[in-house]
């Protein structure tokens, strides 16, 4: 919509059918999560579909599928209603989300906000680094350590270490 004068725009939304079938093609697909609230990645994506998905990217968080163990790693543990996600697939696949379980308690995200001096501007071309382990002075990282990514002297990503396979945008 382009308006060249002051005016009012009245938009009426129609809820998405929760049984919508998403037809994903090979590689990158931008899709929505059609439910209110939150649902865990492992529970809302049908089990027989998960092997076709390598990763899911959200705003500032990612989930990486370990096909050997069937586990998801990274800070994106829950899909959130009204948000969009990039699904990275290794083959064409069609699926419908499993609806969230009523009354299911959402656990806190492992992602903590970093101090302002380590903040960065979110990019439309964001990438993620998945860090399995790291040391400082020969000592393993702990939950108070921050991983910082630079491009020259500009901070382009940062994340508190939260354990194995920390995603750093």
Q: Residue locations for each model-derived region?
A:
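N-terminal exported-region signature
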Residues: 1-142, 146-169
């Amino acid at each position: 919509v382009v308006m060249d004068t002051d005016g009012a725009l009245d938009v009426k939304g129609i809820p998405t059918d929760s049984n919508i079938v998403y037809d994903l093609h090979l590689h990158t697909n931008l899709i929505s999560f059609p439910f209110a609230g939150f649902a865990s990645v492992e529970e809302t994506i049908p089990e027989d579909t998960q092997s076709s998905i390598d990763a899911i990217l959200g705003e500032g968080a990612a989930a990486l599928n370990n096909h050997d163990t069937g586990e998801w790693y990274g800070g994106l543990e829950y899909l959130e209603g009204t948000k969009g996600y990039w699904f990275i697939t290794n083959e064409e696949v069609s699926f419908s989300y499993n609806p969230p379980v009523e009354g299911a308690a959402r656990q806190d995200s492992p992602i903590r906000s970093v101090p302002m001096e380590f903040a960065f501007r979110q990019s439309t071309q964001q990438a993620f680094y998945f860090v399995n382990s790291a040391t400082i002075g020969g000592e393993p990282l702990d939950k108070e350590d921050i991983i910082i990514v630079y491009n020259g002297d500009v901070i382009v990503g940062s994340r508190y270490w939260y354990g194995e396979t920390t995603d750093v945008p």
